[in-house]
Amino acid sequence: MKSTILFFLALFLASNNPLHSQSTNQLIHHNRNIEFRNPPAFNPDWAPFFHGVASGDPLEDRVIIWTRLTPEDMENGPFELSWRMATDPQLENIIQTGNTQTNADKDFTVKVDVEGLAAGTTYYYGFTYNGKHSLTGRTKTSPGVNEVDQLKFGVVSCSNYQAGYFNAYHRLADRNDLDAIIHLGDYIYEYADGVYGNEGLFTERKLEPTKEIVTLEEYRTRYSTYRLDTNLIRAHQQSPFITVWDDHETANNSYKDGAQNHTEGAEGSWVDRKSAAKQAYFEWIPIRERASKQVFRSIKYGNLVDLIMLDTRLEGREEQLDDVTSDAINDTTRTILGADQKQWLLENLANSTAQWKVIGQQVVFSAFNVGWTSLASSTPGGYYEIESLFLDIWDGYPQERTQILDHIRENEIDNVVILTGDFHTSFAFDVADEPIDVSLQADPTFGMIPVHSSNDNYNAETGEGAVAVEFATPSITSANFDENGGLTLATILQAQINNTIQPNPDLNIGNPNPHMKYVNLIKHGYFILDLTAEHAQADWFYSDILTPSSDEVFAQAWKTHDQDNHLSESNEPSPPKTMQSLPAPPNPLGLVNDIEDIDSPRSFALLGLYPNPFTTINYLHYSLTQSAHVRISLFDVTGKRIRLLQDQKVNKGIYSLQTDASKLAKGIYFYQIQIDDQLYQAKVIRE
């Protein structure tokens, strides 16, 4: 394809603002016109289970069920509630019940590992506290060792609250044939309010806390904010999730011992921040508890799939390099997994008897060649400068990637499918070790240029040499290439990144990424992974993020046939399952759509008091479903008002009020919260 010097110059200039690595010292705008909307911050009819229900980590005989209780007075507890599991949406055919407790130490979250279940079975569950019922959730156990003909998974990643509406979650909730939703990380983002997202939504989708999150209380509050999104609630309600974290659950471009977006000292210690982020994750996500707080694990889906979930962030990753010419990049001991996890992965691959070995992980695994975009640059070393921007992915750890691919090849392991998130793009790759040769040559017009040529490792026409395939899911909402570099630039890059590039009639630099069979750098959404005895197929679906919408479009489908280990295009999405489960009902048990005889519908919810007890700073986290006059005071045990904290008109939304009580005496205090004519009270203790 022909292009112009102007294109290469523009692309190079744009690349100086890293297309994926974000930093909180820069305001990133998405300048698109949007229709202003303002949905409720919580559903008062769901009290005290405002955050809905969820399930996760299904095994053949058990599954995690989750909820969050929101006590009206935010006492520390403990609070006792009951749960039940049934085979019908009305929760009439109950097969198990039990009681459990929660308290402030768990941020009032609840997890139950329900055992003794039947394999490959759809169940419905719910919680009750003080006579009030939660939403009913739907979940499904894995088939275990049993034979299974077809599996379907929704695959998602990168849901930035302020970048757009979670419409893709809504569409996944509408599906009745999913075995689970696989979330590959960046479930939340750590940035301060108004820093990273769509500026037209900063008011509409306000973040709490408003600052960058660092402490346990701040991570908890951010999860609480996300989990009040109705689309996310519905997705969790209707399908079990299987999750791993990526970097933004802690901080941007994190690794074992630090992160690009962490300043040691000024933001506390990385050890403390990482520990707080992990604790909040395990509290708010329906993942099975492990004392080690590790997230790499495997789940068997019958004879068809072994699902192997990896942690390429916090478990063992060494710090990212910033120079592709560094000798360290080819150090054979350099690791993104850590020694223990890598050995565990290799053993799982070698010992698997399942037809498909599906690896869920975070960052792009395949070789990703982008240095050619520097052709118009007069900067010495422009090729290396561009390539050095993309070392957070497996390209920054090439020797470990080679070791894994050698293991697959030498052990003749077929049907390996790699699932990838993180990059905010859709990709389908044939996975081969060094699928293209790159050499730098002198050119009188462009200076040093990369020339790409085929080699014996991989044949792009036949797929020979590939040992696996990789499917990358787009972001739910997080910024794509067009939102970082402009739509025109992204469209041109999308058209050229895996095609022959000819800057002028006399210069052909070849195809930099012939193993990349599908690319979309612009759209948001998810893909459905469909697995049968014949194929593993990814179907990409895209939806708008700038307005609430239930619309979506099917884009493309790519698949690998049994033992092919390379991709071919499919003409249509995989068909739905013939047997589909009934959806969980939209309202809690006993609640109908038309509620009568309510004189003063609830408009306020106290979502958290962090921490309690506290020493200096306390946060009051609350939500309004409508605008109201808010008056919040702090009283001591004698009834004397110590401080008026807030007295103003407040729009509906989610808020956190910070109180510095460092000069107060130790003891018991009470918040008095007046919302128009409604009065609430909450006790806190200063130690």
Predicted features, each with a name:
Residues 80, 122-124, 619, 656, ...:
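Short, conserved beta-strand segments of beta-strand-rich sandwich/propeller modules, principally
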Residues 21, 135-138, 643-644, 648-649, ...:
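C-terminal tail/sorting-segment detector
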Residues 119-120, 615-616, 626, 651-652, ...:
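Surface-exposed loops/turns
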Residues 23-113, 117-592:
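Long, structured stretches of catalytic cores involved in phosphate-ester chemistry, encompassing
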Residues 6-15:
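Bacterial N-terminal signal peptides
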Residues 67, 422, 594-634, 656-662, ...:
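Glycine-centered coil/turn sites that cap beta-strands in beta-rich domains
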Residues 108-112, 653-659:
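Short strand-edge motifs at loop-to-beta-strand transitions and within beta-strands
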Residues 1-4, 686-687:
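Positively charged n-region of N-terminal signal peptides that target proteins for export
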